[in-house]
Amino acid sequence: MLMPKRVKYRKQHRGRMKGKAKGGSLVAFGDYGLKALEAHWITAQQIEACRIAITRTLKKSGKLWIRIFPDKSYTKHPAESKLGKGKGNVEGWVAVVKPGRVMFEIGGVSEELAREALEYAATKLPIRTKIVKRHEIGGEAV
């Protein structure tokens, strides 16, 4: 699973997911990308499930870039524990994804295969997504 090697503080506030993604909203590395249309926490397990789904669809062709990383910890109390007694233990790691963020990119494959792989990966995520293509203006990639 993806998680930070070390962090300054183990436990974090939940925070709020306001607005759209500031960066990472364009396809930068590959030719096709999977873009989020909603804000959500994407867990390390969901990212791994998408990675496996895409690599199995692509087989040995093409290249995959994962553009999100789970760097936020979330905590949980054990089942049937009373209220209080401090903040719970770290349960897992999540990536905060806002609308407009490109989460996965694929390059070096045909459009049909890329679309098939990204559609399959989208079923593993708890948010609505959109498949986007790299924009080329004047013969130059943007």
Curated annotation (Swiss-Prot):
GO molecular function ontology, one term from the record: structural constituent of ribosome
Stored CDD domains: Ribosomal_L16_L10e
Keyword line: Ribonucleoprotein, Ribosomal protein, RNA-binding, rRNA-binding, tRNA-binding
Family: Belongs to the universal ribosomal protein uL16 family.
Entry keyword Nucleotide-binding: no
Chain's gene name: rplP
Record function comment: Binds 23S rRNA and is also seen to make contacts with the A and possibly P site tRNAs.
Lineage: Bacteria, Thermotogati, Thermotogota, Thermotogae, Thermotogales
Name of the protein in question: Large ribosomal subunit protein uL16
